[in-house]
Regions:
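Metal-dependent phosphohydrolase cores
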Residues: 1-194
């Protein structure tokens, strides 16, 4: 397969050297959440930024915020498949997704942060899901099937805004947030002067 930047990669043989943040940001800004069944175009990049924002507001460490921003980065290479379809595809899909996610997390240096903060990131992801359902979908509790994963989870207090911008704008915002969080993480890793 060919990336936005013109590089070849094989999803079944993904290695960290195949991963480039510009390709990730570009692809995620174009991939729609929920198979496109939202009121307006809403991308995985926007979702990822929301997850990072939720983590920031909850005073999560910078490493957790960065891992939250990149929690779906592997979808830049294999797409965003809605969860009910993933379940129907079974182990073959799960294995492929896990392998690609591992390569992407290694390349972007968030393997340990994702592991260390996995529960916090997953909770922020579910809060984002509840927020997206509230703000972007025509959900009616009396008409639609329940979303069991959202049981007891409240949406984020802020409504999703700034929806009319182009995918390129969202890719740029994603890259800016990535650079900011990565720089903050690196600064925190430096030994402090006495």
């Amino acid at each position: 397969m060919l990336t936005f930047s013109g590089r070849d990669y094989l999803p079944t043989q993904m290695v960290p050297a195949d991963v480039h943040i510009e390709d990730v940001a570009h692809a995620l800004s174009l991939i729609c959440r929920f198979g496109g069944h939202t009121e307006v175009h809403y991308s995985v990049a926007q979702h990822s930024l929301l997850v990072a924002r939720i983590l920031e507001e909850r005073a999560a460490p910078v490493e957790a915020q960065l891992a939250g921003l990149l929690h779906d980065a592997h979808e830049a290479y294999i797409g965003d498949i809605p969860t009910p379809i993933k379940r129907a595809l079974g182990a073959a899909w799960g294995d492929l997704e896990a392998d690609v996610a591992t390569a992407v997390r290694r390349a972007l240096d968030v393997t340990f942060a994702f592991h260390d903060w996995e529960d916090l990131i997953k909770h922020a992801d579910v809060v984002a899901l509840a927020t997206e359902r509230r703000d972007l979908m025509h959900f009616d509790a009396d008409r639609n099937l329940p979303w069991r994963i959202l049981g007891g989870v409240a949406p984020f207090h802020q409504k999703i805004g700034a929806l009319g911008w182009s995918p390129q704008w969202w890719a740029d915002v994603f890259l800016d947030r990535y650079d900011t969080l990565r720089s903050a993480r690196e600064a925190a890793r430096l030994p402090h002067a006495a």
